[in-house]
Amino acid sequence: MIMDKSIPKATAKRLSLYYRIFKRFNTDGIEKASSKQIADALGIDSATVRRDFSYFGELGRRGFGYDVKKLMNFFAEILNDHSTTNVMLVGCGNIGRALLHYRFHDRNKMQISMAFDLDSNDLVGKTTEDGIPVYGISTINDHLIDSDIETAILTVPSTEAQEVADILVKAGIKGILSFSPVHLTLPKDIIVQYVDLTSELQTLLYFMNQQR
């Protein structure tokens, strides 16, 4: 199956949603699903579904629908969900602590396997209820050198985000999910995704106001 590596970012962001839908369809015993069924489940139009799928070659035949189990396995493969992906978290403030308690592995094969904060943080040297060890930020290199971790979740204050991101890159991290509302200047081969809760809430309020 041929995959177009130049897919739009909007399409890429929907991949995990498609995967989730096909897993749900499979659990419900649905063997075939039309583009309309998929679109309705996601709240988008069927043309968007067909356009998204066109980037991945022949995923289904017109008039026959999409094979649910086949597509579930396809998206699991491109999202690397056949094997466990270990990630690290840096920043054990309010957001960081909430994420430490979030059970990623209950839904997907991702797990936070270690966390870091300032060496002076009370959590350093301890293990969370879910068995995640918390280390001092000065030991990042020591703990990553023999690990398979290439992804980090960054939940530090915006004033520290760039400095910490630089440390992560030097330690071998290839991808960062940043909750800090600042743009990070990093090498081009480092992938960064931003989660700005304030911006998302403001966007929601804007659309709500437009409906009044």
Swiss-Prot record:
<dbReference type="InterPro" id="IPR036291">
    <property type="entry name" value="NAD(P)-bd_dom_sf"/>
</dbReference>
<keyword id="KW-0804">Transcription</keyword>
<protein>
    <recommendedName>
        <fullName>Redox-sensing transcriptional repressor Rex</fullName>
    </recommendedName>
</protein>
<dbReference type="InterPro" id="IPR036390">
    <property type="entry name" value="WH_DNA-bd_sf"/>
</dbReference>
<comment type="function">
    <text>Modulates transcription in response to changes in cellular NADH/NAD(+) redox state.</text>
</comment>
<dbReference type="Pfam" id="PF02629">
    <property type="entry name" value="CoA_binding"/>
</dbReference>
<keyword id="KW-0520">NAD</keyword>
<dbReference type="InterPro" id="IPR003781">
    <property type="entry name" value="CoA-bd"/>
</dbReference>
<dbReference type="GO" id="GO:0003677">
    <property type="term" value="F:DNA binding"/>
</dbReference>
<dbReference type="GO" id="GO:0045892">
    <property type="term" value="P:negative regulation of DNA-templated transcription"/>
</dbReference>
<keyword id="KW-0678">Repressor</keyword>
<dbReference type="Pfam" id="PF06971">
    <property type="entry name" value="Put_DNA-bind_N"/>
</dbReference>
<feature type="binding site">
    <location>
        <begin position="91"/>
        <end position="96"/>
    </location>
    <ligand>
        <name>NAD(+)</name>
    </ligand>
</feature>
<keyword id="KW-0805">Transcription regulation</keyword>
<keyword id="KW-0963">Cytoplasm</keyword>
<dbReference type="InterPro" id="IPR036388">
    <property type="entry name" value="WH-like_DNA-bd_sf"/>
</dbReference>
<dbReference type="InterPro" id="IPR009718">
    <property type="entry name" value="Rex_DNA-bd_C_dom"/>
</dbReference>
<keyword id="KW-0238">DNA-binding</keyword>
<comment type="similarity">
    <text>Belongs to the transcriptional regulatory Rex family.</text>
</comment>
<dbReference type="GO" id="GO:0005737">
    <property type="term" value="C:cytoplasm"/>
</dbReference>
<dbReference type="GO" id="GO:0051775">
    <property type="term" value="P:response to redox state"/>
</dbReference>
<dbReference type="GO" id="GO:0003700">
    <property type="term" value="F:DNA-binding transcription factor activity"/>
</dbReference>
<comment type="subunit">
    <text>Homodimer.</text>
</comment>
<feature type="DNA-binding region" description="H-T-H motif">
    <location>
        <begin position="17"/>
        <end position="56"/>
    </location>
</feature>
<dbReference type="InterPro" id="IPR022876">
    <property type="entry name" value="Tscrpt_rep_Rex"/>
</dbReference>
